Curated annotation (Swiss-Prot):
Pathway recorded for this protein: Carbohydrate metabolism; tricarboxylic acid cycle; isocitrate from oxaloacetate: step 2/2; Organic acid metabolism; propanoate degradation
Name listed for the protein in its UniProt record: Aconitate hydratase A
Residues holding [4Fe-4S] cluster: 441, 507, 510
PANTHER family: ACONITASE/IRON-RESPONSIVE ELEMENT FAMILY MEMBER (PTHR11670)
Record note on quaternary structure: Monomer.
Coiled-coil ranges per UniProt: none
Residue ranges annotated as propeptide in the record: 1-2
Organism in which the protein naturally occurs: Deinococcus radiodurans (strain ATCC 13939 / DSM 20539 / JCM 16871 / CCUG 27074 / LMG 4051 / NBRC 15346 / NCIMB 9279 / VKM B-1422 / R1)
Pfam families found in the cross-reference section: Aconitase, Aconitase_C
Cofactor binding description: Binds 1 [4Fe-4S] cluster per subunit.
Role: Involved in the catabolism of short chain fatty acids (SCFA) via the tricarboxylic acid (TCA)(acetyl degradation route) and probably the 2-methylcitrate cycle I (propionate degradation route). Catalyzes the reversible isomerization of citrate to isocitrate via cis-aconitate. Could catalyze the hydration of 2-methyl-cis-aconitate to yield (2R,3S)-2-methylisocitrate. The apo form of AcnA functions as a RNA-binding regulatory protein.
Broad class of enzyme this protein falls into: lyase
EC number annotated for this UniProt entry: 4.2.1.3, 4.2.1.99
Reactions catalysed: citrate = D-threo-isocitrate; (2S,3R)-3-hydroxybutane-1,2,3-tricarboxylate = 2-methyl-cis-aconitate + H2O
Length: 906
């Protein structure tokens, strides 16, 4: 076996770049004898180039090249390897990833290996964007004060990352207050084409990546293959392992026509999300094609690509074309780099034009851009799109609808409930907009909707309109370039005047870091037990995510966020009812403050240029003085501190000595959690704040940490003790094993008591009882949060049985040695009469195969046992190895240790 690359098919060729005499090589797909790759989807061509270039007859084989080159619309499910060019991280997922790498180094020393072998082999960039919160808003001091609080709360985490910067090769950090990882990636980090030095010259190849955040797909808008993975999978990639995946189906999404007046990129993204969720694209690539792409700007494409997790696809891919080249120029990329991108993609037959023949796809779907109308999505899921004109009636219907994806099931006697805002005579009712936030890289990367929001604010101020006093407002750009062009356009001042001051450069409200609502507003909500609303330009609106007091959450474009802040409610018809009165007492309607497409374009043309991007990103890694002032610890090994509440050495490698275990049946298991459909990773492992009376809160209180210093679950992901206590602790979790409760509770079947999920798991662990989770459809949807799998594992859960799994979470469960099982033939726990109070035995053969049927013996309280058949969702042979080793990192570490010890013996 060798890890030296081969030159299969003699495909290594010289690339000529016009205007350059630099000698470059590439792996030419057109030299693949016996394969016509001309009509392959472009996304598949990128995978093909990767296996062709990386073929070494070891972890990437000749048959892998043949498999990808022979991709067909009806491919059988065959496993292929993929080696991305780089990895991106954000700090909530990045800190635990670096913790794992540090723990692997400690384990290597303990086992007699060389810790320096644990080192990223490809470029890794971590952008700190998840920690800043909206504590202060609506003032000119909000940005500075929120940044100060961020550093105060996260000092220990940031010291750890500073250590990581010096300890690991190929590891860069973009400091706090720089922007959101996906927007920074789009505007700065992405190159289009990567290169590496070989003996006789430089080899160039497509930029590609994985990221520890599900919205990594935003980069697909620039024609770059990439998607979100769990931290454990990303760590394996950093250490040189391929990602093993089933050959994907590719759904072609044909775009025709052009956008109408008044519609935005957000409206388009919400429509695409709705269509693709209805289509069913989980685990599939979506590739956009058609002449209508020429009527879409690259930021519009990036907005759609960003929401691939919301429509369930692995990617939402747009091929490189002239618009991609224009975007690279507009964002200040070097002309030599742009010329290389053009030459490379044209040479490979990957460059799109309106005349490009349509690729062959697994299936297709079509959308005429002219049909897009202003929209929102909610109140609980991003795929539940609502026409703006119907918003008021749909919300009012939701108040009494059953509690499922769209309803709140209020009785008729509760519909007129009100609450009084303390210290005033102002009353609010159901549908009051208590939070309006321009947030998220999904939209703040798109100048057209940010400029539109600024123009709405300008027109509103000129007419004397003000934001309603119960609305918490915020603007959190995904990059500092946004501030540059809003100020140049003269629009930031108007946003400031109606409360949309910049509160930080990070994810903030979109990920639940919205900060507390003003206490008088909270009291009014509680007084009337109100279903109040948020309107945000984010990408997710799951229950309990945005703010614990806000039950109805709607995704909308930035200009609509501003409009709803002015209206103050979703109950009224915002299209036809007045949203306020001007200084003369005359009614003002939405149409009076809504900008035309021409007004938006004019403002963009005069306020955005490439020099802005160069100014913002030149030296950004050292641009934050507070970051630079943090002292840097030296050394290859991290000095773990037992009293730290942020960073602890996790127990994942404690049992690494010895080889992989044999697959054995799981006997005597009990159900810890039973849930319905659409349970998200945020339900499983919440990222937001927590209270003193939770298991995590009690853990910190016992260690002298005051509640004001708890920070958030997301910021504590470097400490497994806290994260285990926070697993299944979302306040909106509805565990059917603890009826009548909401949050992290279950029934301990050893004694029949309702208790916290953590306390129950501890009791089961002490009694030697393995655990199981029972779930419905789309289990684990949402963020790529690997702690949703890590926490599940640490609670003692050995298996999860679901009707279906979201892609990343299924992979993460296997990566942690937890067995994912799927009901067959449309069966469910309820249809099979499984209540959750039974005991379970999972009959696993020693030679378990991918996607094999296995038997589960279910024994009821009456002692009767029946067998059910489920599918093992370990999908590939490599995943079988991961499961035998107890997880992916254990597999990788054993391999590195074996190789290291072999080198020593040699």
């Amino acid at each position: 076996m060798s890890d030296k690359a081969m030159n299969l098919f003699g495909a290594r060729d010289t690339l000529q770049v016009p205007g350059s005499d630099k000698k470059l090589y590439f792996y030419n797909l057109n030299k693949l004898q016996g394969h016509d790759v001309s009509r392959l989807p472009v996304s598949i061509k990128v995978l093909l180039e990767s296996v062709l270039r990386e073929a070494n007859d070891y972890d990437v084989r000749r048959e892998d090249v043949e498999t990808v080159a022979g991709w067909s619309a009806t491919n059988p499910e065959v496993e292929i390897p993929f080696k991305p060019a780089r990895v991106i991280l954000q700090d909530f997922t990045g800190v635990p990833a670096v913790v794992d790498l540090a723990a692997m180094r400690s384990a290597m020393v303990k086992l007699g290996g060389d810790p320096s072998k644990i080192n990223p082999l490809i470029p890794v960039d971590l952008v700190i964007d998840h920690s800043v919160q909206v504590d202060e808003f609506g003032t000119e001091f909000a940005l500075a004060n929120n940044m100060a609080l961020e550093f105060e709360r996260n000092r220990e985490r940031y010291e750890f990352l500073r250590w990581g910067q010096q300890a690991f090769d190929n590891f860069g950090v973009v400091p706090p207050a720089s922007g959101i990882v996906h927007q920074v990636n789009l505007e700065y980090l992405a190159k289009g084409v990567q290169s590496r030095a070989e003996d006789d010259g430089e080899v160039v190849y497509p930029d590609s990546l994985v990221g520890t955040d599900s919205h990594t797909t935003m980069i697909n808008g620039l024609g770059i293959v990439g998607w979100g993975v769990g931290g454990i999978e990303a760590e394996a990639v950093m250490l040189g392992q391929p990602i093993y995946m089933l050959m994907p189906e590719v759904i072609g999404f044909k775009i025709t026509g052009a956008m109408p007046e008044g519609a935005t990129a957000t409206d388009l993204a919400l429509r695409v999300t709705q269509m693709l969720r209805e289509k069913g694209v989980v685990g599939k690539f979506v590739e956009f094609y058609g002449a209508g792409l020429s009527n879409m700007t690259l930021p519009d494409r990036a907005t759609i690509a960003n929401m691939a997790p919301e429509y369930g696809a692995t990617m939402g891919f747009f091929p490189v074309d002239d618009e991609a080249l224009r975007y690279l120029r507009r964002t200040g990329r070097l002309e030599d780099e742009i010329g290389l991108v053009e030459a490379y993609y044209k040479a490979q037959g990957m460059f799109r034009t309106d005349e490009t023949p349509d690729p062959v796809f697994t299936d297709t779907i079509e959308l005429d851009l002219a049909t897009i109308v202003p929209s929102l999505a909610g109140p609980k899921r991003p795929q539940d799109r609502v026409n703006l004109s119907d918003m008021h009636s749909v919300f009012n219907e939701a108040l009494t609808a059953p509690v499922k994806n769209r309803g709140f099931e209020l009785g008729s006697d509760k519909l007129d409930a009100q609450g009084t805002i303390g210290g005033t005579d102002i009353k609010i009712g159901h549908g009051a907009v208590t939070l309006a936030s321009i947030t998220s890289c999904t939209n703040t990367s798109n100048p057209s909707v940010l400029i539109a929001a600024g123009l709405v604010a300008k027109k509103a101020v000129e007419k004397g309109l003000k934001t309603k006093p119960w609305v918490k407002t915020s603007l959190a750009p995904g990059s500092r370039v946004v501030t540059e062009y809003l100020e140049t356009a003269g629009l930031q001042q108007y946003l400031d005047q109606i409360g949309f001051n910049t509160v930080g450069y990070g994810c903030m409200t979109c990920i639940g870091n919205s900060g507390p609502l003003p206490e008088p507003v909270v009291e009014a909500i509680q007084e009337g037990d109100l279903v109040v609303a948020s309107v945000l330009s984010g990408n997710r609106n799951f229950e309990g995510r945005v703010n614990p007091h806000i039950k109805a959450n709607y995704l909308a474009s930035p200009p609509l966020v501003v409009a709803y802040a002015l209206a103050g409610t979703v109950v009224n018809d915002i299209v036809n009812d007045a949203i306020g009165q001007d200084s003369n007492g005359q009614d003002v309607f939405l149409k009076d403050i809504w900008p035309t497409n021409a007004e938006i374009q004019e403002a963009m043309d005069r306020s955005i240029n490439a020099e802005m991007f160069k100014k913002v990103y030149d030296g950004i890694e050292k641009s934050n003085a507070d970051w630079n002032a943090i002292p840097v610890a030296e050394g290859a090994l991290f000095d773990w501190k037992e009293d730290s509440t942020y960073i602890q050495n996790p127990p994942f490698f404690d049992t690494l000595a010895g080889g992989a275990h044999e697959i054995e049946s799981i006997k005597g298991a009990r159900a810890l959690v039973k849930v319905g459909d659409s349970v998200t990773t945020d339900h499983i492992s919440p990222a937001g704040s927590f209270k003193a009376d939770t298991p995590a809160g009690r853990y910190l209180t016992e260690r002298g940490i005051a509640p004001k210093d708890f920070n958030s679950y997301g910021s504590r992901r470097g400490n497994d003790r806290i994260m285990t206590r926070g697993t299944f602790a979302n306040i909106r979790l509805k565990n059917q094993l603890a009826p009548g409760t909401e949050g992290g509770f279950t029934t301990n079947f050893l004694n029949g008591e309702v208790t916290s999920i953590f306390d129950a798991s501890t009791a089961y662990k002490e009694a030697g009882v393995p655990l199981v989770v029972l779930a419905g459809k789309d289990y684990g949807m949402g963020s790529s949060r690997d702690w949703a799998a890590k926490g599940t594992f640490l609670l003692g859960v050995k298996a999860v049985i679901a009707e279906s799994f979201e892609r990343i979470h299924r992979s993460n469960l296997v990566g942690m040695g937890v067995l994912p099982l799927q009901y067959k033939n449309g069966e469910t726990a309820d249809s099979l009469g499984i209540n959750g109070d039974e005991t379970f035995e999972f009959v696993l053969p020693g030679d378990l195969k991918p996607r094999q049927d296995v038997t589960v013996k279910v024994t009821g309280k009456d002692g009767n046992t029946r067998d059910i058949t489920v599918m093992c969702r370990i999908d590939t042979p490599v995943e079988i190895d991961y499961y035998k080793n107890g997880g992916i990192l254990q597999t990788v570490l054993r391999g590195i240790l074996s190789k290291s010890q072999g080198e020593v013996k040699a």
